[in-house]
Curated annotation (Swiss-Prot):
Keyword Transmembrane helix recorded: no
Keyword terms of this UniProt record: Capsid protein, Helical capsid protein, Host cytoplasm, RNA-binding, Viral nucleoprotein, Virion
GO CC term, one of those recorded: viral nucleocapsid
UniProt record similarity statement: Belongs to the tenuiviruses nucleocapsid protein family.
Protein's name according to its UniProt entry: Nucleoprotein
Function recorded in the entry: Encapsidates the genome, protecting it from nucleases. The encapsidated genomic RNA is termed the nucleocapsid (NC), and serves as template for viral transcription and replication.
Record: residues binding RNA: Y43, Y46, V76, R122, K240
Domain remark from Swiss-Prot or TrEMBL: The N-terminus is involved in homooligomerization.
Molecular function as annotated in GO: RNA binding
Compartments, record wording: Virion; Host cytoplasm
Source species of the chain: Maize stripe virus
Any Pfam family the entry gives: Tenui_N
Length: 316
């Protein structure tokens, strides 16, 4: 049992805030060494309180810098890097330090049946503000599914797996988003992104084991997980709003989305959302008002879709 486990929600939020603050300071003060670590390793529903406790128990005085390096590992090499590190027989630059982190925190490449398993992905999502700065600082980071796959080229920064931590839902049941908000747009995008990532990366044997044989099965599964993440109370509402603002800043003017971004959203709607079969589209229409608007107007041209989306966000 983790001896440093936060006792309540306030303590959990404070612990995340404190460690994030220290980790961000380390990232700012040690950009050169973090960049070196990045270069060395690079190629050309869990209980947050328990995980925080385990990290604090194992990390001690080096926890903040370790969090930064684990997050760098996650976004430079992916969650499977843990398995790569443990298989290495020949030491390379950065590998010994990465291996030490794997050993110290008992990092694993996938959760399996261990609810308290520590993966690079979980660390990154537990400290979204640190993850945001890491992904902002380094260029050329790869995604399994990027913005071009969503017909929204140039918006990769919206798709990182920590972004759902910033999303606030309007309802605890579908439709989850009904207001004309930034969170509504992020939720809509991540419903599709999570579906496509799982469809591409989950091994076929695991899909079969979980009964994820059709697109409708996969998207119901991934949307359920997304909703759980969005409902997380790891961050208070002020932190969530601040995170949304930071993530969306390149695409906004005076807290309103640029028309050029709404054009990309229309492209996403017409070329991706509307491309799915009837079952999937019907499911999507039930998840939020924006998806319903897109699905209900599947026959429209992309320009007509753009006009509808602009109107949708100007109604309130």
């Amino acid at each position: 049992m983790a001896t440093n486990k936060p006792a309540n929600l306030n303590d959990l939020q404070k612990a995340i805030n404190d460690i994030s603050k220290d980790a961000l300071k380390y990232l700012t003060d040690n950009k050169a060494s973090v960049t070196t670590f990045h270069d060395q390793i690079g190629y050309a529903g869990y209980d947050a309180a328990t995980l925080i406790g385990i990290l604090k128990d194992k990390g001690g005085a080096t926890l903040a810098q370790d969090v930064v390096k684990m997050i760098v590992m996650r976004y430079v090499r992916g969650t499977g890097f843990v398995k790569d590190v443990t298989k290495k027989t020949k030491a390379t630059a950065g590998s010994e330090e990465a291996a030490a982190l794997v050993a110290r925190y008992g990092l694993v490449s996938s959760v399996g049946s261990n609810a308290n398993a520590i993966t690079l992905g979980r660390v990154a999502q537990l400290f979204p503000n640190v993850s945001f700065e890491v992904t902002k600082q380094f260029t050329g980071l790869k995604m399994a599914i990027d913005s071009s796959d969503l017909s929204m080229s140039g918006t990769d920064s919206l798709l990182w797996d920590f972004v759902p931590q910033y999303i606030t839902l309007d309802s605890s049941s579908a439709p989850y988003c009904t207001t004309k908000s930034v969170a509504h747009i992020l939720f809509s995008i991540h419903v599709i992104h999570a579906f496509l990532v799982t469809k591409k990366t989950m091994p076929e044997a695991k899909k079969k084991e979980r009964g994820l044989l059709k697109d409708i099965d996969i998207i119901k599964y991934t949307t359920g997980l997304l909703v759980i993440t969005c409902q997380s109370k790891n961050l208070n509402e002020a932190k969530k709003k601040s995170g949304r603002t930071k993530v969306c800043e390149p695409y906004c003017v005076n807290e309103k989305f640029k028309e050029s971004f709404l054009a990309l959203l229309a492209s996403f709607g017409k070329n991706v959302v509307c491309s799915y079969g009837t079952q999937v589209k019907q499911f999507l229409a039930e998840q939020c008002s924006l998806m319903k608007t897109i699905v209900d107007n599947s026959s429209k041209t992309q320009d007509e879709m753009k006009a509808l989306i602009i109107e949708f966000f100007e109604e309130e």
